[in-house]
Amino acid sequence: AYKTVLKTPSGEFTLDVPEGTTILDAAEEAGYDLPFSCRAGACSSCLGKVVSGSVDESEGSFLDDGQMEEGFVLTCIAIPESDLVIETHKEEELF
């Protein structure tokens, strides 16, 4: 499992994300309420921004390459590849 720090508007939370599990699924299992809508990488409701670490978003993403290079990720499809620090609730920053 990878240690993942979620920086949310209501505080900072740390959880272990099992290998192959998305950030959103792991957060929900741990009882954290992150925003989401489609759960399929096709919208930006669940948008987060990686501060440190890396994720696999090969499932296909609504984001373009430039947005991904800036560190934006869709937590519903992003699978940690290392320990992570991620800021959640970032949808407003995209537009």
Swiss-Prot record:
Pfam families: Fer2 (PF00111)
All residue ranges annotated as the 2Fe-2S ferredoxin-type domain in the record: 2-92
Gene3D superfamilies on file: 3.10.20.30
Cofactor(s) it depends on: [2Fe-2S] cluster
Cofactor comment: Binds 1 [2Fe-2S] cluster.
Chief location: plastid
GO terms for cellular component: chloroplast
SUPFAM superfamilies, per database record: 2Fe-2S ferredoxin-like
Keyword match Chloroplast: yes
Record bears the keyword Acetylation: no
MF term (GO), any: electron transfer activity
Positions that bind [2Fe-2S] cluster: 38, 43, 46, 76
GO biological process: electron transport chain
Cell location: Plastid, Chloroplast
Record InterPro entries: 2Fe-2S_ferredoxin-like_sf, 2Fe-2S_ferredoxin-type, 2Fe2S_fd_BS, Beta-grasp_dom_sf, Fd_pln
Entry's family note: Belongs to the 2Fe2S plant-type ferredoxin family.
Identification of the protein by name: Ferredoxin-1
Organism for this UniProt entry: Equisetum arvense (Field horsetail)
